[in-house]
Amino acid sequence: MPKASEIKKGFAIESNGKTLLVKDIEVTTPGGRGGSKIYKMRCTDLATGARVEERYKSDDVVETVEMNKKAVSFSYVDGDDYIFMDNADYSQYVFKHADVEDDLLFINEDTQGIHVILVNGESVGLELPSSVELVIEETDPSIKGASASARTKPARLSTGLVVQVPEYIATGDRVIINTAERKYMSRA
């Protein structure tokens, strides 16, 4: 069984008899000598949908649950439901808007590399690719000769996500965004 320091976002863990899907991990290092790192995991209870916070020291052993992943593509929206289609057998996976709200900031009809996470045969979440290509919908005008400076400006992307981009980037440019850090990486 892995230690808490080896658990990543998207893992399914067993805690107090509940199966939890890890949505976010925050690492803190307490002051003082010899203090081990504390891993605060924000999770969703797969049975009830409730949000749960678990805390572990870096060397605590955490019980994981076996997961499967299937490659999917975003298909369409039906009211409050977001439908993703299996790339192999064309079966569909339905997610409520609230369940995938954060992930939707990185997904458009062209996004490749999305995986649905299955626990005990049931779809519980999405795994995004490490980076996605998106179009800048709105940003301040680019400044000629600004490539020499390291200043940034906010830009709203086609999915609604707002990131800081270099000053030379203009509206309509295609950019690559790191999904884990929510940061600009490069032009596409």
Curated annotation (Swiss-Prot):
Domain of life per record: Bacteria
GO molecular function, one term: translation elongation factor activity
GO biological process, one term: peptide biosynthetic process
Pfam family, one: Elong-fact-P_C
InterPro entries on file: Elong-fact-P_C, NA-bd_OB-fold, Rib_uL2_dom2, Transl_elong_fac_P/YeiP, Transl_elong_KOW-like, Transl_elong_p-like_YeiP, Transl_elong_P/YeiP_cen, Transl_elong_P/YeiP_CS
Gene3D superfamilies for this protein: 2.30.30.30, Nucleic acid-binding proteins
Any GO CC annotation of this UniProt entry: cytoplasm
Family: Belongs to the elongation factor P family.
Name of the protein this chain belongs to: Elongation factor P-like protein
Organism in which the protein naturally occurs: Vibrio vulnificus (strain YJ016)
Lineage: Bacteria, Pseudomonadati, Pseudomonadota, Gammaproteobacteria, Vibrionales
